[in-house]
């Protein structure tokens, strides 16, 4: 049987990937401070994120409706179609994570609860139960043919596999030498390779991702949709998942491709949060103040063109004047020169 052991994460990951964790951790700390200072701005982001998360996670699985209809469902409308019932179930589970994350942990009961919440109105027999028969992960090719992408754990071995997965996760989570942002994607790979349900595995995995991020101290999923990012880059997401599941049954798989993909998605979420925050918080500011705020709030070096893109109503002349003044006042530093020049808050 598959062995679940994450001790390799102590020293088995390339150093350049380890550095990414430090960047993401800094971004997270920065936004925790922002959140206390700009409550209303983050509340607007929260309202937007719940819609995008519900839409994105279900859309990946071909479960769709209009954005307006999703808004109606979130506000209490009665679901009519099969898809709307599944969408509403995901919304309820996601809301539970956002409101009760301090009282939730990744466990067998919580995993089954998420599945039950999603499926009870469309498939009450299977809802909240592990798969009753073996299943395959299929891929539909452009020419209409099918191929088996992965052969998951058998139905009669699922309960034990989930138990061993959870024990390995608990053990690794307590080990201070194991970066939790490496542990989360490894857990997701293993969960999806087990594929414990006949339907809904992908959506449950995304709920677990958001919950595990909360547990690790990252509430990014409350303000920026992780599911939306996965949906927008789902080809690379599934390619990385397939690479990291190759050799899984023989304990020979390499988690690195999926770890890298996960960190890229997380970084994009923080970048989007930074941009969204600027859009909301700078609406009423003077043009020169908006340019300065963009520069001071940037989490990575940005170019003049980047500033123009963020502030299309601000003239190039105004941007250049602010840049020159901030350089003179030593508020920012210049990296590179001429067309490749980028600017960053001075440390």
Regions found by a protein language model. Name each.
Residues 1-347:
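FIC/Doc superfamily catalytic core
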């Amino acid at each position: 049987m598959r062995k679940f052991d994450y001790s390799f994460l102590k020293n088995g990951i390339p150093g350049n990937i380890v550095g990414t964790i430090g960047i993401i951790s800094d971004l997270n700390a920065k936004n925790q401070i922002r959140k206390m200072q700009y409550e209303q701005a983050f509340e607007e982001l929260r309202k937007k994120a719940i819609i995008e998360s519900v839409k994105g996670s279900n859309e990946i699985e071909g479960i769709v409706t209009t954005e307006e209809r999703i808004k109606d469902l979130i506000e209490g409308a009665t679901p009519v179609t099969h898809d709307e019932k599944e969408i509403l179930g995901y919304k309820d589970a996601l809301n539970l994570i956002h409101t009760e994350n301090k009282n939730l942990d990744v466990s067998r009961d919580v995993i089954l609860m998420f599945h039950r919440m999603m499926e009870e109105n469309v498939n009450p027999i299977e809802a909240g139960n592990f798969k009753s028969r073996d299943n395959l992960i299929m891929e539909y090719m452009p020419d209409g043919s099918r191929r088996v992408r992965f052969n998951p754990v058998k139905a009669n071995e699922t309960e034990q596999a989930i138990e061993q997965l959870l024990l390995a996760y608990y053990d690794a989570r307590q080990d201070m030498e194991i970066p939790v942002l490496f542990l989360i994607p490894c857990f997701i790979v293993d969960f999806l390779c087990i594929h414990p349900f006949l339907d809904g595995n992908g959506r449950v995995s995304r709920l677990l991702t958001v919950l595990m991020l909360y547990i690790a101290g990252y509430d990014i999923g409350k303000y920026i949709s992780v599911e939306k990012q996965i949906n927008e880059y789902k080809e690379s997401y599934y390619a990385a998942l397939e690479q990291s599941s190759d050799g899984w049954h023989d304990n020979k798989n390499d988690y690195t491709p999926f770890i890298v993909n996960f960190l890229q998605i997380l970084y994009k979420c923080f970048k989007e949060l930074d941009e969204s925050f600027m859009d909301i918080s700078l609406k009423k500011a003077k043009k020169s103040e908006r340019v300065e705020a963009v520069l001071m709030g940037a989490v990575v070096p940005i170019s003049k063109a980047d500033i123009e893109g963020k502030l299309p109503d601000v003239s190039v002349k105004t941007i250049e004047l602010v840049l020159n003044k901030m350089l003179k006042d030593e508020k920012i530093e210049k990296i590179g020169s001429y067309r490749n020049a980028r600017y960053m808050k001075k440390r």
